[in-house]
Amino acid sequence: MDRAQKREFVDQLAAVFAETSMVVVSRNDGLTVADVTALRVKMREAGAQYKVAKNRLAHLALEGTRFDGLKPMLKGPTALAWSQDPVAVAKVAVEFAKTNEKFVLVGGALGTQMLDASGVKALAELPSLDQLRAKLLGLIQAPATKVAGVLQAPAGQLARVFAAYARADEADAA
């Protein structure tokens, strides 16, 4: 990489850090190309990204961002993963760490809050934003569904009573 490419890479990474809500730092020492490719595919499916970056370039990109506290974690062969959905990137990273012992979580940051590896694991246990939205929608719709059922019940009962009277009148007439 020449200087212009490095500057462009740092600028791209800084732009990512300005827009994202969660960054996870991991050790990627000993991972095969197939492992990294599989991890990238899983990250993309979850709406996250995974990138191996030189620590010095990552340091430069982190300067002045809310993730500035990640700098001490950037030692040795590290990689960064990020996403708008904080739970998605944490879940993929934790699940991959369970299946691949060479992938080690170092920590991360959620906004300005720095997390160690156990903090990232705890975050991975939370429901995702989509799951929370579905639960909230279900909670909002449940009362309306119950009210509609209650309002329809008397009308249905009244219709059954009229039908019973009609059958009784037909039976008496016959």
UniProtKB/Swiss-Prot annotation:
Keywords: Ribonucleoprotein, Ribosomal protein, RNA-binding, rRNA-binding. PROSITE patterns: RIBOSOMAL_L10 (PS01109). One of its GO terms (cellular component) is large ribosomal subunit. It comes from the Bacteria. It holds the Pfam family Ribosomal_L10. InterPro entries: Ribosomal_uL10, Ribosomal_uL10-like_sf, Ribosomal_uL10_bac, Ribosomal_uL10_bac_type, Ribosomal_uL10_CS_bac. One of its GO terms (biological process) is translation. One of its GO terms (molecular function) is large ribosomal subunit rRNA binding. HAMAP family: Ribosomal_uL10. Forms part of the ribosomal stalk, playing a central role in the interaction of the ribosome with GTP-bound translation factors. Belongs to the universal ribosomal protein uL10 family. Part of the ribosomal stalk of the 50S ribosomal subunit. The N-terminus interacts with L11 and the large rRNA to form the base of the stalk. The C-terminus forms an elongated spine to which L12 dimers bind in a sequential fashion forming a multimeric L10(L12)X complex. This is Large ribosomal subunit protein uL10. It comes from Acidiphilium cryptum (strain JF-5). The gene is rplJ.
